Amino acid sequence: MAGHSKWANIQHRKGRQDAKRGKIFTKLIKEITVAAKMGGGDPAMNPRLRLAIEKGKAESLPKDNIENAIKRGTGQLEGVNYEEARYEGYGIGGVAVMVDCLTDNKTRTVADVRHAFTKHGGNMGTDGCVAFQFKHVGQIVLEPGASEEAVMEAALDAGADDVIPNDDGSIEVLTSPDPKAFEAVKEALEKAGFKPAVAEITMRPEAETELAGDDAAKMQKILDALESLDDVQEVYTNAVLPD
């Protein structure tokens, strides 16, 4: 089914993230450290680490930072012990919000996340309260103008789960969230001459809710507050906000 506002929504989320570029390196270093801790320091044997390094390089994260983050993850260098944590809640009009964190103090993090919700008119929920409204997927988005037929052929041959043409001309390719499966499809598309505008393993909303006016402005404040927290890695919502 075509997603009428999918491309605009993705661009909006990326725009929010780009506006906070001062935090990008910190988030990337945390993800590399945790990936190395969980799966080992060899990118060839650790797909999550490989993807994290690739993302770091795309953001011009210095090589020394990458190498030191890996060493902290494997214990070769002393470092902070981060844990993964996910929190769920509701924004304006009951829209769904999921917040993924890497933290060394869950007590602090849960208090900060709850405060960000409540201060701006949202509320934090219990585990699982909105998770069913999202699907864990590999998501590759091609900008408007790509050939749907060529994308479909390359993606499905490489094992993609679905290819979705959107009303705005962008094309969304969905894969398994398994990093190896995701990489295989991404590489096949690149080999076919396509350059993904977005390529990530993410939580994709099953349905979206458009907000406008004051509701959109209030929702933006909730998202900004959550994304400004040091422990927050990703914020997902099914809200669609105007540009």
Swiss-Prot record:
Location(s), subcellular: Cytoplasm
Alphabetically ordered keywords of this record: Cytoplasm, DNA-binding, Transcription, Transcription regulation
Main location: cytoplasm
Single biological process term from Gene Ontology: regulation of DNA-templated transcription
InterPro entries per UniProt: Integrase-like_N (IPR017856), TACO1_YebC-like_2nd/3rd_dom (IPR048300), TACO1_YebC_N (IPR049083), Transcrip_reg_TACO1-like (IPR002876), Transcrip_reg_TACO1-like_dom3 (IPR026564), YebC-like (IPR029072)
Designated name of the protein: Probable transcriptional regulatory protein Tbd_2215
Family statement drawn from the similarity comment of this UniProt entry: Belongs to the TACO1 family.
Entry GO CC: cytosol
Transmembrane residue ranges: none
PANTHER family, per the entry: TRANSCRIPTIONAL REGULATORY PROTEIN YEBC-RELATED, TRANSLATIONAL ACTIVATOR OF CYTOCHROME C OXIDASE 1
GO MF assignments: DNA binding
